[in-house]
Each structure stands twice: as C-alpha cells, then as structure tokens.
C-alpha cells in the first residue's frame, strides 16, 4: 500500500528531478524519489555491514597471522 508523503527539496534537487523526468529515464518525480531512496537504503545497509565488521574486528583482538598469511589465505579462498 502506497503512502503519500510531501517532501521539500531545494532548487538544485528540483532541477535534477525535472531533468531526470524530462530525459525519459523516469516517468515522474515520484519514481525519481523512490529510486533515490532505494539507493540510500542500499548504501545505509552496506555502511551498517561495514560498521559491524569493524566492530567485530576490533573486538576480536590482534591476529597472530602476518599480512602475507592473510593475503595467501584470501588468494586460496577466492582462487586468485
């Protein structure tokens, strides 16, 4: 179910939205906004995953592996 939400944007973003619609890439300003919000959602999800990985790494302590060991392990795992 769709919900109507009003959003205020500055002239620069309004101009960008208009150009995207006029180019034919999007059928409406709403499509541009939905696309932008989907990208923001994906970016936020990736950022959260990175933050969690950093926290996990910091909490795991120091590794006994050398940089060379880590590189070799990655190469083997990804068959590079």
UniProtKB/Swiss-Prot annotation:
Alphabetical keyword list: Toxin-antitoxin system
InterPro entries named in the record: ParD, ParD_sf, Ribbon_hlx_hlx
GO biological process, one term: regulation of DNA-templated transcription
The keyword Magnesium is annotated on this UniProt entry: no
Family: Belongs to the ParD antitoxin family.
Function: Antitoxin component of a type II toxin-antitoxin (TA) system. Neutralizes the effect of toxin ParE.
Protein name according to UniProt: Antitoxin ParD
Record organism: Escherichia coli O157:H7
Lineage: Bacteria, Pseudomonadati, Pseudomonadota, Gammaproteobacteria, Enterobacterales
Gene, per the UniProt record: parD
């Amino acid at each position: 179910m769709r919900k109507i939400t009003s959003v205020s944007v500055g002239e620069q973003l309004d101009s960008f939205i208009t150009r995207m619609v006029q180019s034919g890439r999007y059928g409406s300003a709403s499509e541009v906004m939905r696309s932008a919000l989907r990208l923001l959602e994906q970016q936020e999800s990736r950022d959260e995953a990175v933050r969690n990985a950093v926290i996990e790494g910091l909490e795991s302590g120091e590794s006994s592996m050398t940089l060379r060991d880590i590189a070799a392990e990655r190469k083997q795992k990804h068959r590079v």
